[in-house]
Amino acid sequence: MKITALLVLKCAPEASDPVILSNASDVSHFGYFQRSSVKEFVVFVGRTVASRTPPSQRQSVQHEEYKVHAYNRNGLCAVGFMDDHYPVRSAFSLLNQVLDEYQKSFGESWRSAKEDSNQPWPYLTEALNKFQDPAEADKLLKIQRELDETKIILHKTIDSVLARGEKLDSLVEKSSDLSMASQMFYKQAKKTNSCCTIL
């Protein structure tokens, strides 16, 4: 999963082209001679997708092996270039955080921007690096991943207990937690299952 670029743009309905307010990209996985062309292409596609994203809307556009996600919050638009495997919910969560941070840092000054800004915004570069892992952008995904890891550990623990030479049958017989009826049910179910396996 890879984020190639993040852009923040002013998308005014009366303007012909969106104005780039901030831009961060990581094109290190491209060949050295391709990098400048890739950056130009990111700006072109980002501007095009942003201009076609209506206010208060989100959209995703497939382009080759990339998805371009855009979120236009009343004229302030965030665009992200991610690979196909980056979860959509995490992508939009990241774009939402980028817009929140931009408005905290710059307020409404973006409304008066008339031309592209070349001034770097450190937060956007940090976000590009930090959110390469989608779980950082999406807290629910992070919690789900932790639960999955816990479940894997639990399965390993049960398997290791049974792998020490103890059999489930002997554990059932020794258990004081199970009533005689439960023990009989277990033995009967095991006989029934073994009967079916032979057939």
From Swiss-Prot:
A lipid is attached at residue 196 (S-geranylgeranyl cysteine). Residues 7-133 form the Longin domain. Disulfide bonds: none annotated. It is a lipid-anchor. The modification Cysteine methyl ester is found at residue 196. Residues 197-199 form a propeptide. Expressed ubiquitously in roots, stems, flowers and leaves. It comes from the Eukaryota. It holds the Pfam family Synaptobrevin. It is found in: Cell membrane. Belongs to the synaptobrevin family. May be involved in the secretory pathway. Essential for membrane fusion mediated by either SYP41 or SYP61; triggers the fusion of phospholipid vesicles containing SYP41 or SYP61 and VTI12. PANTHER family: SYNAPTOBREVIN HOMOLOG YKT6. This is VAMP-like protein YKT61. The gene is YKT61.
